[in-house]
Amino acid sequence: MGTARWLALGSLFALAGLLEGRLVGEEEAGFGECDKFFYAGTPPAGLAADSHVKICQRAEGAERFATLYSTRDRIPVYSAFRAPRPAPGGAEQRWLVEPQIDDPNSNLEEAINEAEAITSVNSLGSKQALNTDYLDSDYQRGQLYPFSLSSDVQVATFTLTNSAPMTQSFQERWYVNLHSLMDRALTPQCGSGEDLYILTGTVPSDYRVKDKVAVPEFVWLAACCAVPGGGWAMGFVKHTRDSDIIEDVMVKDLQKLLPFNPQLFQNNCGETEQDTEKMKKILEVVNQIQDEERMVQSQKSSSPLSSTRSKRSTLLPPEASEGSSSFLGKLMGFIATPFIKLFQLIYYLVVAILKNIVYFLWCVTKQVINGIESCLYRLGSATISYFMAIGEELVSIPWKVLKVVAKVIRALLRILCCLLKAICRVLSIPVRVLVDVATFPVYTMGAIPIVCKDIALGLGGTVSLLFDTAFGTLGGLFQVVFSVCKRIGYKVTFDNSGEL
């Protein structure tokens, strides 16, 4: 077994070809030419630390993905990539190291294999994981950005800066989860996938492989679809315990689970314009993937072949487990074996039945919870709409009152304006006229006696005139009569006073 491991190690030390990776300096903003792998060209905020280095992973002279690497934990914090495509089969696995992580003064700017780095890099392995750290351990090099999702012939993903310790079973389930999510849930709901930004990362635990490389407590994935008018963002978490399945979370909730509470995507991947219908479709597929994973785990746990040798040995009688060669021991073992097999069969049947019952109850509970969540969501939406309508009316009341007050003030101003106009017109009349109008009653009252006097004098004169006229007329008549009488023989003399 040791020989096979050393042969495998020798095969991993093969020439890297055109594979390279550039260590981005602290003075450079972002990840340099690898900023294109981040939404809006902006790496996650809040993850900067002295022990973190930025790497622009390249292959064949082109950028492939970006990695933020922790020199303290010797595992990647996250890797960022876009639009994954299936990789060609038969590519050779060549695990490489980054020389400038351990030796900043190194002239080697490309990733090289560990065998070459031993003689050319000072303090190799002081800040990054090496292939030898994984030898004789229960862990394998698990890629955050899997080779199976890369179309690079030179396999840029086979760098130790893109790997973290994973058990074989967890690594297999993690890769299956990534393939299922990318092929069935994420890429189909993001157009052609060209606008799909992916972040995969780790959260280290306190346990370390050979007291050097931190084993992840859980791994996570965050996806941002930047399709105009139909974008979305989702997060996923998978704990390294064998019994755990991948969990879907909102990006905001995922950020709270990570150290330093970072912001993974600028403005949360256009949160205000996200397409909720596409997110619902993604969650439906994710639920199917989770159910499939539970089914696979249930089948594995119920299989007799999956039991360990230690569990089988505990069911054997002491004579058989000790390998007694006595006839009595063999006889007892022969007699006890059928009962032990029967007990094992009953045990596995009971366990399988219980697991299926629990799984059935879990499915029923999940459906009930989903129904309750749907009802609560609709009730909440209706309540919010109701209060929004009431709020709009309440908010509009002050505005309407202000409009009425404004109209009243406007009417009062019009009345005041009319009064001012009347006053101005009155004030524009000459003062003499106003005095005459004011003194008219006085003059009128003072002229009444004079007018009455004049009227009386006029009436007296008229009466006197009438009397004079009457007497003159009578005198004239008498004069005529006397004249006639004189002519006819009567002589009557009158003096001037009219006496006979």
UniProtKB/Swiss-Prot annotation:
Residues 1-21 form the signal peptide. GO terms for molecular function: endonuclease activity; metal ion binding; nucleic acid binding. Residues 293-323 are annotated as: Disordered. Its main location: secreted. It is an enzyme of class 3 (hydrolase). Keywords: Acetylation, Endonuclease, Hydrolase, Immunity, Innate immunity, Nuclease, Secreted, Signal. Residues 297-317 have a biased composition (Low complexity). One of its GO terms (biological process) is innate immune response. InterPro entries: DNA/RNA_non-sp_Endonuclease_sf (IPR044929), Endo_G_ENPP1-like_dom (IPR001604), ENDOD1 (IPR039015), ENPP1-3/EXOG-like_nuc-like (IPR020821), His-Me_finger_sf (IPR044925). Its EC number is 3.1.30.-. Gene3D superfamilies: Extracellular Endonuclease, subunit A. The modification N6-acetyllysine is found at K407. One of its GO terms (cellular component) is cytosol. It is found in: Secreted. The keyword Nucleus does not apply. Transmembrane segments: none annotated. Interacts with RNF26; this interaction is important to modulate innate immune signaling through the cGAS-STING pathway. Belongs to the DNA/RNA non-specific endonuclease family. May act as a DNase and a RNase. Plays a role in the modulation of innate immune signaling through the cGAS-STING pathway by interacting with RNF26. This is Endonuclease domain-containing 1 protein. The lineage of its organism: Eukaryota, Metazoa, Chordata, Craniata, Vertebrata. The gene is ENDOD1.
